[in-house]
UniProtKB/Swiss-Prot annotation:
Disulfide bonds: none annotated. GO terms for biological process: protein transport. The lineage of its organism: Bacteria, Pseudomonadati, Pseudomonadota, Gammaproteobacteria, Legionellales. This is Type 4 adapter protein LvgA. Keywords: Cytoplasm, Protein transport, Transport, Virulence. It is found in: Cytoplasm.
Length: 208
């Protein structure tokens, strides 16, 4: 009986492997499935880039790597990824955590908030007034660009994103903002926001 059981189980294994092979072949021949898989991979190491078009900002070569800083009054570091600072361009990505962060965008969103803070400090140090038009451009993962746009439109500065069309998502976002405000929850806080400087407890570190 034991030998028979082994043969039956082996048959199930062979059938399962055959089914997997057929599924894999079908996926390889399906352009939509390939695009979906590529998008999923990109989501795991999503990148984001912020370019300052106007006013002119000198390029830094080689780029400076801004690492997470120690939060004052604690032993924790900022909950952000490394930022590559090229002067007129700021870049980051989830690549260092791509296997542990999964599809979570929390840490990337916090990093984007820090990038917006760096942008504002750069405008201040350059003597740019809040009324002067500042032109920037985005690159990277679509969801990261949406987060950056949400932060930018809540700045006191006159910052214009030249290459991002919020489209239907933007309309829904504004509708949700108004709906929450009408219910008494208020409007989103003004940017830049230093939420990345709050210590992240051990129970929430998985949100990378």
């Amino acid at each position: 009986m034991a030998d028979g059981d082994i043969e039956i189980k082996a048959g199930f294994v062979d059938t399962d492997l055959d089914d997997r092979k057929l599924t894999m072949i079908d996926d390889l021949n399906n352009p939509l499935a390939i695009v979906e898989r590529v998008y999923l991979i990109w989501w795991h190491w999503a990148d984001f880039h912020l370019h300052v078009i106007s006013p002119h900002i000198d390029t830094i070569t080689p780029a400076i790597v801004i690492e997470p800083e120690l939060i004052p009054g604690s032993n924790d570091h900022e909950f952000v990824y490394s930022i590559h600072d090229s002067g007129s361009k700021l870049s980051t990505s989830k690549s260092q955590d791509m296997f542990s962060a999964g599809m979570s965008m929390c840490k990337l969103f916090y990093t984007i908030e820090k990038m917006v803070y760096i942008l504002v400090e750069r405008l201040k140090s350059g003597g740019v007034s809040m009324e002067a038009e500042v032109q920037i451009a985005f690159a990277g993962h679509e969801i990261a660009q949406r987060k950056a746009f949400e932060s930018i439109i809540n700045l006191p500065y006159n910052v214009v994103v030249t290459n991002f069309d919020p489209g239907i998502w933007g309309e829904k976002y504004l509708q949700n903002v108004k709906r929450l405000a009408d219910k008494g929850y208020g409007y989103p806080p003004e940017s830049p926001r230093k939420i990345y400087m709050h210590p992240v407890s051990s129970g929430t570190t998985a949100r990378k």
